Amino acid sequence: MIVGIDASNLQRGGGVTHIVEILSNVSIYKHNVSKVIIWGSEYTLSQIDNYPWLKKVTPKELNRGLFSRLIWQKFGLFNSAVDNNCDLIFAPGGSVLCNFRPIVTMSQNMLPFESREARRYGISWITLRLILLRWLQSKGFKSASGVIFLTNYAKEQVIKVIGNLSIPSTIIPHGLNPRFCEEPKKQYDKAKYNSENPFQILYVSIVDQYKHQWHIVEAVAKLRKEGYPVVLNLVGPSYLPAKKRLMESINKFDVNDEWVKYHGPVPYLELHHIYKEAHLGVFASSCENLPIILLETMASGLPIACSNKGPMPEVLGNAGIYFDPERSIEVYHAIKKLIDNAQLRSEKSQASFHKVKRYSWDVCAFETFSFLERVAINHHQSLCMK
């Protein structure tokens, strides 16, 4: 079997990480696959290692803008798949524009399907883009030969919007890079911490409208006001309007620039070092499909104060302390509860560390290609019966 992978709309972030990891972890010969063809931009394909069975293709349209990529998906993908004798196309970006069948797609972005979250962007190009993505992905999920979801939550939310699916679907969560795995540290009483040795709180995430960093700043400010020797470390790139809101919050609550440390983006290959310096992790997003950063925080052996929205309770289970990310007072109580109780911190960090072990790129790669193989076989059998 020859599998084609449409990576034309994968530019950065989790989508690229996913395709890099499944290709580096799959044993294609376990799935009756002889060759994999992948189409993507030069930048995307440069991040993927070379393998004897992998052919990388970059049509000139994929190095251009969104419109050019969509035109290629509609017309160029079909011809290239036929020319390469593909038996199936895997489109992990969620869009299905060409008429080639069978084709399997994937749900990786929840923002287009959660209107309340999308409205945070007001009248903007991002809102228009989310509307376009919602239309494209809804159409893609309905017309595909199979769909992969990352969580039960994501599947339920998408089905609420587009209705029940009549095609095969499955749930295959992403994996986790083992370099993030760090046995939970010994937890100390809060009396151990002081201004010279402060309690380090870490929140890794892009600064964006649905990530709520400003509420975390306000919550930690209340802890500081009560005498807790805490420092808040914020790590990640930023969306400019959200960054402005964050800076306003920092200027309001940390006037002397003493305890909020915004580090900006940190290279992915160095990120695990950041987790090692923290004493507690916070995750305050209100919109996720499968929160990779939450998995990284769990694997890093940190006690976690976590948003109660989206799939977070499904992923973290009873291994964290939850809060409403839009209510700073709830964030304050969740963090305070963990700081005040070293035994609770120890129990939660151990529980989350063991829970995250089920997220494996080996398993993700095996289950993904098994599903692709199953869809291809079913499609072939249905053609033979006609």
Annotated model-derived regions:
Residues 127-147:
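Membrane-proximal helix-turn-helix segments that form the acceptor-binding/catalytic region
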